[in-house]
């Protein structure tokens, strides 16, 4: 059991206020720990960042530079600013083209989307912005190899590297 003093209000921003900063569902862990004053061990919630400053002041500085997501088939994406790099052909998830259901053999192995102009992710702009794609891939590679996307001691990924969805780690080019 954790005993804490009565915490202050979670959100101090006026009702109806919006925040355009990048956050991730994984941030809930660190945010709640921060709210309740619980220190997290270095090997706990390695991809979680507290959003509490944003709950209290939506115009505060961003709490994270980028976010990693994993789709239902295990494919990884990285989101940074207006960019999203998907390390898979197709959707990697529930929408068309679905992995294992729809033919993705003729699709590019990787996709880059400008989320400010294309929130539906329909226009792959990887050929127009190869430097952006390489930068995002390099960051994602570091996160996977470090076992975390936050500062701290690198963490081991458990088990043998059998994820087919990270085979791009061994490939050189995008």
Q: Which residues make up each language-model segment?
A:
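Compositionally biased, intrinsically disordered low-complexity regions
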Residues: 5-8, 172
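C-terminal cap/loop subdomain of S1 sulfatases and analogous C-terminal strand-loop tails that border
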Residues: 7, 13-17, 21, 26-29, ...
């Amino acid at each position: 059991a954790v005993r804490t003093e009565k915490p202050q209000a979670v959100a101090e921003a006026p009702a109806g206020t919006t925040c355009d900063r990048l956050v991730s569902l994984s941030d809930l862990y660190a945010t709640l720990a921060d709210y309740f004053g619980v220190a997290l061990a270095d090997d706990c919630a390695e991809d979680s960042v507290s959003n509490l400053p944003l709950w209290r002041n939506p115009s505060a500085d961003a709490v994270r530079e980028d976010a990693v997501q994993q789709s239902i088939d295990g494919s990884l994406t990285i989101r940074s600013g207006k960019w999203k790099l998907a390390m898979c052909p197709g959707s990697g998830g529930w929408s068309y083209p679905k992995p294992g259901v729809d033919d993705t053999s003729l699709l590019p192995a990787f996709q880059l989307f400008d989320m400010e102009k294309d929130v539906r992710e329909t226009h792959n702009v990887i050929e127009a912005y190869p430097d952006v794609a390489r930068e995002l891939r390099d960051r994602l590679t570091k996160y996977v190899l470090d076992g975390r996307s936050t500062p701290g001691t690198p963490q081991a990924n458990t088990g043998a590297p059998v994820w087919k969805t990270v085979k791009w780690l061994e490939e050189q080019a995008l």
